[in-house]
């Protein structure tokens, strides 16, 4: 009985603490038309302290979404265009000799920002990708002999263009796994596109985005997200989903046995649990339900399941495999 009361109290507390989510959504909605999934993905990544890999053709408001979020959170934003000639020093910074001081001084790179847009990450060679991914993992960078912490909150939004593969350097599986979420951005609906065109033709310019929350508030909100209740049955459900990617036959998914080259790692289980918690929080609920897990499952697992040559030959996608798993794993 006491647990029920505690859950009720927790739910009321989360409802109070998550009021800013709707305010943030409304503020971003002034500029971003539609793309609710993209906005939710950004919020989940921000609240879970995870990074996001976005896949979508150019012109779908990826840059606009993260710059708008940065303005609404009153945070520092930086955009890095990845090119074949980019060097790690262009990203993290370097030591510059100062004739005035007769000593080397640190010039910090664009990675020192709260929100970093890594545009077309697969356009740069492995050493540059590694520099970014190390910064993402450690949340600090080394320049010369000194290590410098990155500002908090720190969110990397990396983009890949699915159409142009010529002259690209695909991210290795181990490095892709560092991204908590991989979201696919789709085209807007007809009415949404009409609204976008009207907004850009009105001559009034883009609406002003106001600061509605501070970076410190985001860090406090992360602590609150950790208090969102997750029942043991939900934990088991998450573990079952991940194990179904490794041992599909145990879940009556024999047909997937020859289609999956490798499944999700323990990092996938952690990411799925954290993302489900954050999803419950942005839905202003103090406890996780199976629908929260299912809502974030595709984004968490999309880049963590390797396909065999057989699956690729049959044009089977990870989307279909994840859907099959969700349809077969018993929901608590």
Regions found by a protein language model. Name each.
Residues 89, 110-137, 151, 166-175, ...:
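Conserved AAA+/SF3 P-loop NTPase catalytic/coupling segment centered on the Walker-B
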Residues 14-60, 243:
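Pre-Walker A (pre-P-loop) alpha-helix and adjacent loop at the N terminus of AAA/AAA+ ATPase modules
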Residues 13-18, 31, 169, 182-255, ...:
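Conserved C-terminal "switch" segment of AAA+ ATPases
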Residues 105-114, 143-160, 171-180:
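AAA+/SF3 P-loop NTPase mechanochemical coupling elements
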Residues 57, 91, 159:
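P-loop (Walker A) phosphate-binding loop of NTP-binding proteins
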Residues 46-83:
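Walker A/P-loop
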Residues 1-9, 14-15, 248-332:
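C-terminal engagement/docking regions of AAA+ P-loop ATPases
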